């Protein structure tokens, strides 16, 4: 709900896809069973990756509206930096390759590419050429790490206890 007006949409307990690591609590044994945070990520999308792996293994994430957490967004990098942009682009490729059901990944790839093109255009027109170059650098780093991501995918998908349809529905 970051940046959204609170009109009561967050007042109910419910299951959600996952939580920001800055506000999440994980059962220790499950966290370690699934390999903890991917050390190749350093920052950005590590929580999305963990949420995916938990969902794939059949674990649920529960939202409690009474829980309060203060998370200083951007504390790692104060403003959108080239380093942050590069990490986001690189890690997003890994998250998708490691976790998305194969057919969903194929089906969504054209959309992912269009969104990337729009994002890069936005960097060029509304930000700076250095952010654009950082995004491109991150994208190519992500492409270079495809073999590593595919090896991790093999391990992750072995723990899968839910159907592709379940994952597709929870991603909507």
Each language-model region and where it sits:
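Glycine-rich phosphate/pyrophosphate-binding loop
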Residues: 5-16, 150-172
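Active-site-adjacent helix/loop segment of glycosyltransferases
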Residues: 57-153, 159, 164
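Alpha-helical architecture
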Residues: 36, 44-45, 69, 114
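A cytosolic small-molecule/anion-sensing beta-strand core signal
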Residues: 20, 52, 65
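Acidic/His-rich active-site region of diverse nucleotide-sugar glycosyltransferases
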Residues: 1-42, 48, 57
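Short active-site alpha-helical segment characteristic of glycosyltransferases
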Residues: 49-53, 69
């Amino acid at each position: 709900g970051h940046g959204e007006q609170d009109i009561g949409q967050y007042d109910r307990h419910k299951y959600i896809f996952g939580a920001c690591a800055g506000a999440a609590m994980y059962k220790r044994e499950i966290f370690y069973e699934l390999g903890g945070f991917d050390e190749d990520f350093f920052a950005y999308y590590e929580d999305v990756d963990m949420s995916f792996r938990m969902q794939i293994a059949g674990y649920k994430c529960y939202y409690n509206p009474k829980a309060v957490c203060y998370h200083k967004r951007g504390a790692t990098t104060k403003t959108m930096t080239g380093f942050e942009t590069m990490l986001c682009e690189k890690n997003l490729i890994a998250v998708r390759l490691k976790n998305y059901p194969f057919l969903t990944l194929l089906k969504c790839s054209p959309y992912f590419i269009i969104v990337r093109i729009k994002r890069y255009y936005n960097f060029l027109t509304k930000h700076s050429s250095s952010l654009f170059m950082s995004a491109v650098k991150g994208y190519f780093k992500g492409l270079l790490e495809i073999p590593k991501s595919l090896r991790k995918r093999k391990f992750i998908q072995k723990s899968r206890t839910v159907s592709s349809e379940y994952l597709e529905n929870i991603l909507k």
